[in-house]
Amino acid sequence: PERAYTRAQLLDQVWGDSLVYLNSKSTSWTDTSIQQGIGYEYQVLKSLPAFPTGEGGQNFGAGNIYSGIKIPPTHHRGACLVVIDRTYKNTLAFEISRLLDDLLYDGWIPDTVFVDKNDAADQVKNGILDWAKKNPDTHQALFLLGRIPVPYSGEIAPDGHNSDHRGAWPCDGYYGTIDGLWTDQTVKTTAAASSRNDNIPGDGKFDNKFFPSKVQLQIGRVDFSNMNKFSESEEQLLRRYLDKNHAWRIGKMQMMEQGLVDNNFPSSEEGLGQSGWKNFAAMFGISNVKDLQYRQTLSKQSFLWSYGCGGGGPESASDISSTTNFTTDSLLSIFTMLFGSYFGDWDYPNNFLRGAIASKTCLASTWGNRPNWFFQHMALGETIGYSTQLTMNN
């Protein structure tokens, strides 16, 4: 068979049996066995020639679609803890109060905890665990606002730069795991160019390079520390973010429902760019996914989602953009995926990923290919936190 469909409901842990096998000339298939009001996720597997390297095993292309008919709106999403840098408890009191209202109106039961930027990560996590135990909701989310202590873990170099970037990387997933053991006993590495990535026993950075359990809490961070390429202060950047976040939630920031992909690694066997193509096609339809230049296009035309990848440094991706550009640009995209070397380690000063959301428009950015992300559920009402948790646990 050239193409096979499997199906699962949202809370299912495994795929069901293949529903149908189609030949290479088929362009559509209708599932007649569904119920209205239920969302179904479909995985499409396409048979491809064997890989040119390795053992020549069977090769598949895979894509996902989340679909349903007359899906009811979600009125109760769960509980959300906003973990806030105590520095801004008073100066951003209005914006924080408004954020809590926005979360409430979006179906969350919001709560807050204030922490000091110099607290130990395990101290912060203990507060999160106490909250989680008191709120045994089906869905729980963390919104990290400000300079919340950054956990580091592993001896990794997912950008491939083993000679100068292998070591501990930022790991907010630590805050999202309720179960599982995090150790600080075995990894010993000081080879990276930055001492931030050093990891030695007993230094407070963890050994784990994989999550020791499922990530149970949805997680997002808004952190503008050490972003001095911007003329605005950290407090001003946080206020601007909360202002545009509110504007988006109440419908004052309108974007065309389409996706842009600018892939400067088109010949990569890894398929860099696939997180853009696969997600955007599932969300908007392939006719609404455009292969265009990132900065030049988004400065003039709006795309709800965008993807850009190119040779990277801590503050840029070649032929995409840079943190310096983000200080003045108002690119017309709310959600963006960016991929390149170094900046996936987002705790660099003036980091490119954080530069995107520090800009005047963008609300969310992710390192777009390692791992591949799954955002298709957002087109049917799920949150970006859900997609993040799903991706972390995949």
Task: Please place each PLM-identified region on the residue numbering.
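Short beta-strand segments within Ig-like beta-sandwich modules, predominantly Fibronectin type-III
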Residues: L19-K25
